Amino acid sequence: MTACQSISTAQTTVSNKITGLFGYNEKLPEIDPKGIVDISKATIEQYEQLSANLPLNQWVYLENEKQGIYQLQNKSTEGFVLSLRLNCKISSHPPTFELQDVQGKRILYGYDKEAGQIQFLLDNKNYGNPFDPFQRQTLSRFQQQLASAKVIKLFHASKLYRFQNQNAELLSKPVSCRENS
């Protein structure tokens, strides 16, 4: 161990002890083996830390019963996050999706006529944008195939985003869908 590594380790240990004194070093909510995590008791800092450290290439269901918020997220190897909102808790809200970059900034969402062409591919079969409100029959076929697909790809503006479809059984869980999202 070098002197720099020793100082770094000591600094981390001291920092953790100090933040622990003020209650900032609380344990993060844990994701169960099924891919579900209860975030209702998490602080904003814990939620941000959990989001930054989501397991890669699988669906994770985040539930917050206190606030009535339920999310389904999949983080790619590159750090992009895909949120699918297929089974909306409030049936009047349309199904939608959101794609975030590594910093958590929204890149794409649902049906955005300003965004240009969006294509979803399930195991390399193209479904176009199944969230287009004028193509609802495509959404139904997309949902059926999604349950058994191995890989989800999203193509937009000459960029391909790739997500593994592990824990696909979570896709049937009800989620919070916001209108105009």
Feature roles, as predicted:
Residues 5-181:
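A generic "folded-domain core" signal
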Residues 1-2:
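Bacterial N-terminal signal peptides
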